[in-house]
Amino acid sequence: MIRKAIVPMAGLGTRLYPIGVVLPKGLMPFALPNGILTTGLQLIAETLLAAGVEQIGVVVSPENRPVYEAFLEGGGARYAPARAKRPEMQRAYESLQTIRCHLTFIEQPELLGLGHAVWCARGFADGEPMLIFLGDHIPLPLGDPTAIQQIAQAFAAHQSPVYGVHRVPTSKVSLYGILQGEPTDAPRLYRLLQLHEKPTPEYAQQHLHTAGLPPDEFFAHSGVYAFPPALWSALEQIAAEHDPTHGEWTLTHAQRRLLQQMPAYLYETEHHWLDFGTAHEYRHAFCYLAERHDV
């Protein structure tokens, strides 16, 4: 089992402006049907821990790190009298402390893309295989680790990169990283042939369709990646070659480099994900979690 996971959360939150100016994306609140308030950070961390992950590295900006740290402190002694009178507050506090014990904050000093964010966590990784979980995705059902465990199990079987995928229609391929695979003998497991970041519908139809899927459906990243230790040497090479004046470098750069060295796989999970990275997506995620009793 992969012991560590990296959760990138260092973005400016421009798609959640102006709230993102004062509230980091990972701390956007959600109200559950039982009346409990929680955050994206908590929902992600709880699912990773339930999946057997032991250490979680959260990549944040230097400006937001104190905000995250203060949140996990849960108010400390200042709120102790109130917690003593309200059991639900004490339970929430204890939940935060459990997460805090397994969590390390890692600073990304410059916002140079997802690949750079993961590279900033190389000290935390210490050369180990790694799960990467995008910081604006919530797995469903809440707290169910099945999808993450399935990807981790596929990684354990092949010792090669495994990427969680879900299906998107042609009309939405330009919003995602799209991956073309070929079926294997294992259910829901495909061997990766190529990937392209946010292609046009025309390009996707000509080059990225996976055999066995309906003509109007494509595989897109679902926000969960399992990488072998070779990821770190690939990122080191990219970091040495990258010219900052050329803008961000994505994780796709490392995925392509690894694909030249070893096979990689796609796993289509049976579960769904909620994205809360934009105002529209956040509204949908908030309402879904608040109203559904089966999450």
Please report, for each region that a protein language model flagged, where it lies by residue.
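Charged, glycine/proline-rich intrinsically disordered loops and linkers
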Residues: 76-98, 198-216
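Cofactor-binding loop segments of dinucleotide-utilizing enzymes, especially the Rossmann-like FAD-
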Residues: 10, 32, 61, 135, ...
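Catalytic-core segments of class I nucleotidyltransferases/pyrophosphorylases
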Residues: 131, 139, 145-148, 152-156, ...
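Short, hinge-like loop/turn segments at secondary-structure boundaries
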Residues: 74-77, 150, 179-182, 284-285
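N-terminal glycine-rich phosphate-binding loop and ensuing alpha1 helix
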Residues: 2-89, 103, 144-146
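Conserved beta-strand scaffold positions in the cores of enzyme catalytic domains, especially
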Residues: 27, 103-105, 161-163, 264-266, ...
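Structural beta-sheet core signal
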Residues: 5-7, 58, 132, 163-164, ...
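Conserved beta-loop-beta/alpha segment of the NTase-like Rossmann-fold superfamily
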Residues: 67-68, 92-184, 236
